[in-house]
């Protein structure tokens, strides 16, 4: 039986990022993500996880290195790089839905304006996606009428409307009430099962273990451990990762005991 070799989708080579005061944020970051793979970035606050996603998306300048999508450069302001970055989707902690537009109009805006798609086709896809996340009855509602979890589900399918090759998720449940976290994570889990390539930053450890094909652990702007989710959560290679997981275990016990 032949082994299926996955193609590289994203490659990052020796990425360097510093703030304006020259303090380094990302230090010699190199990683790759294969098509259909889900890679989870873990690490303490301030380790550079979210900044890494923002640099991939072109929202932050870099001081060195390469970011390639299917072998093509996506760094910089050139028309070619900007066009390639349209193959990326990103969902943030904040939903960033336009408050004066209905949910349906929020979903239609980018496909029609950026990709020039016909309204009829875009409406059909938007309704199919709303049905997938159980929000068919909300297409004419406005963002203020939705819960946080519902808004985040809309934000996810708004990115899917652009048919991204790679999805970036930056702490998408961080701003949600605990009861709303599951409904959003279920959507992301379903996307992984459908083969969507994803790079995910999260502090939801149980979710990370369930969804990841690989775990990258960051500390001080560097990748200090790469592992399978099974090995990382059972017996991480580095002492720093062990401390990190012990801290989360302590937090969980504290919450359970209250």
Regions found by a protein language model. Give the residues of each.
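C-terminal boundary and immediately downstream tail of ABC-type ATPase nucleotide-binding domains
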Residues: 230-258
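ABC family nucleotide-binding domain
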Residues: 5-220, 224-229
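Short, Lys/Arg-enriched, disordered terminal segments
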Residues: 1-6, 258
